[in-house]
């Protein structure tokens, strides 16, 4: 990542259905006075391959372009309400996989949120997701196991909202060598 006095260029692939609200929430967290950040918002092109891109999506984001991604310092892939689908049934899965390869090859810092984390864990490490018997919904304590610059200012733990129908296999996550 860049030095503190430089602007940090972060790309965000916004996969959520409530794009405006998701954008507002990420901007509130990532654009602080003590950290100069420029956010570039993207949408998956393949998601709109058979239909027109909605006006609100066009106004707030641009088509995912790996050449533009290569110029960024970091990249975030948001969640999406797709956890009930098999990964291969997602219309833009190959586009995501190309993005994952690009980010890794270019050495770009990555953050995956919710379903974005599930699909990345599956792609990079073969970790499976499984459906829960009922939706997990609520605010739960999180523990920080390792310090990282992105987590500066947080205590040893924090509360985070959860709303999902699937989880990753904990035993497979524990087997990941990294």
What does each model-identified segment do?
Residues 1, 63-67, 101, 149-151, ...:
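Short, flexible, glycine/charge-rich loop motifs used to bind or transfer phosphoryl groups or to couple energy/partner
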Residues 1-88:
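N-terminal beta1-alpha1 cap of cysteine-dependent amidohydrolase-like domains
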Residues 9, 74, 108-110, 158-160:
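Beta-sheet entry/capping signal
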Residues 17, 47, 80-83, 117-119, ...:
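Short, solvent-exposed loop/turn segments at secondary-structure junctions
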Residues 40-41, 110-114, 162:
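A structural signal for short, well-ordered beta-strand segments and their strand-loop junctions
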Residues 77-145:
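Cysteine-nucleophile active-site neighborhood
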Residues 123-178:
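Pocket-forming structural segment of enzyme catalytic cores
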């Amino acid at each position: 990542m860049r030095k503190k006095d430089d602007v940090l260029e972060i790309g965000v692939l916004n996969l959520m259905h409530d794009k405006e609200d998701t954008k507002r929430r990420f901007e509130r967290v990532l654009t602080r006075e003590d950290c100069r950040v420029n956010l570039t918002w993207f949408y998956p092109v393949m998601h709109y391959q058979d239909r027109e891109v909605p006006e609100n999506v066009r106004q707030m984001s641009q088509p995912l372009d790996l050449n533009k991604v290569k110029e960024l310092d970091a990249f975030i892939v948001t969640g999406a309400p797709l956890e009930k689908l098999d990964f291969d049934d997602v219309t833009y899965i190959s586009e995501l996989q190309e993005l994952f390869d690009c980010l890794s090859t270019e050495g770009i810092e990555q953050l995956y949120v919710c379903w974005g984390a599930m699909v990345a864990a599956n792609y990079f490490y073969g970790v499976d997701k499984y459906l829960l018997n009922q939706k997990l919904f609520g605010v739960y304590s999180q523990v920080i196991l390792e310090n990282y610059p992105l987590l500066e200012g947080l205590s040893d733990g924090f509360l985070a909202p959860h709303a999902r129908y699937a989880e990753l296999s904990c035993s497979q996550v524990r087997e990941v060598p990294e």
